[in-house]
Amino acid sequence: MIHPSAKIHPTALIEEGAVIGEDVFIGPFCIVEGTVEIKARTVLKSHVVVRGDTVIGEDNEIYQFTSIGEVNQDLKYKGEATKTIIGNSNKIREHVTIHRGTIQGCGVTAIGNNNLLMINVHVAHDCQIKNNCILANNATLAGHVELDDFVIVGGMSAIHQFVIVGAHVMLGGGSMVSQDVPPYVMAQGNHARPFGVNLEGLKRRGFDKPTMHAIRNIYKMIYRSGKTLEEVLPEIEQIAETDSAISFFVEFFKRSTRGIIR
C-alpha cells in the first residue's frame, strides 16, 4: 500500500506488499522488497535497497547505496524470519549496511531515534543502537553489539561481538573494542583502554558540576582504587540509590558479561 502523498521516482522498484507512508520520498533506482514498512516523511535519496521484514520510522534521511534489512553474514543463518527496525529522525549516510537479526540472537537488529551513521558504517545482525548516537566513517559493529544513548564511535573503529558500550561513552578513532565500556568513559586504542571521563560531552548535554564530580569519583573507584570491580560495586550501588546518574553504572554492570576495558 502506497500513500497517495508519497513521491516515488519512476525508476524505483516497490514490491507489492510494501507499506509506504505519508509524504515519503523514494528517489531514483531505489529497491523496496518484502514486508517493508516506511513511515511518514522518510526520504530515500537514491539507489537505496531495503529488504526483508523491515520497519523504518518517521523523518529519516537515508542516502545513496545504503542497504537495510539484507540477509546477515552469520553462517548459521538459514533464512529464518527475523527483523530490522529503525526508529525516527535518523541520518544514514552513503554505503551504510544494516543487516537483519538471527534466531540465535534477539531476532531483531534495532536502531532507535536521532542517530547519525556516517559513510561506510556496518551494523551487523542483532545489534541494538539506542538514541542520539554518532558512528563516524567506517565504524564497524559486529553481531549482538549494544550501544546505549549518546555513544560516539570514532572513525575506523571496530567493536567485537556481544560488547556493550554504556551511555555517553566516546570511543576515539581507530579503536578496537573487545570488552564492555562503562558509561561516561572515554576510550581509545587497539585494544581500547580507558583514559578518563567524557566531561566535554556531559557539559554539552547539561550535566551539572556536582553530577560530573560524582561520575569522576566512580571512575576513580573503578580504575584507580586498586580494587576489583566486585569490591567497589557495593559502594557504587549505595551511591546510586540517591543519584540517578550513577544508576547507569549499576544497570550497566548487571548486563555486562565480557568484563570491562582496563
From Swiss-Prot:
Coarse class of the protein's main subcellular location: cytoplasm
Enzyme class: transferase
An individual GO BP term: lipid A biosynthetic process
Keywords linked to the UniProt accession: Acyltransferase, Cytoplasm, Lipid A biosynthesis, Lipid biosynthesis, Lipid metabolism, Repeat, Transferase
SUPFAM superfamilies associated with the record: Trimeric LpxA-like enzymes
Membrane-spanning segments: none
EC annotation from Swiss-Prot or TrEMBL: 2.3.1.129
Cellular compartment(s): Cytoplasm
Domain of life: Bacteria
One annotated Gene Ontology cellular component of this protein: membrane
Gene Ontology terms for molecular function: acyl-[acyl-carrier-protein]-UDP-N-acetylglucosamine O-acyltransferase activity
InterPro entries linked to this entry: Acetyltransf_C, Acetyltransf_C_sf, Hexapep, Hexapep_transf_CS, Lipid_A_LpxA, Trimer_LpxA-like_sf
Family: Belongs to the transferase hexapeptide repeat family. LpxA subfamily.
Alphabetical list of NCBIfam families matching this protein: lipid_A_lpxA, PRK05289.1
Subunit structure and binding partners: Homotrimer.
Function of the protein: Involved in the biosynthesis of lipid A, a phosphorylated glycolipid that anchors the lipopolysaccharide to the outer membrane of the cell.
Descriptive protein name: Acyl-[acyl-carrier-protein]--UDP-N-acetylglucosamine O-acyltransferase
Organism: Haemophilus influenzae (strain PittEE)
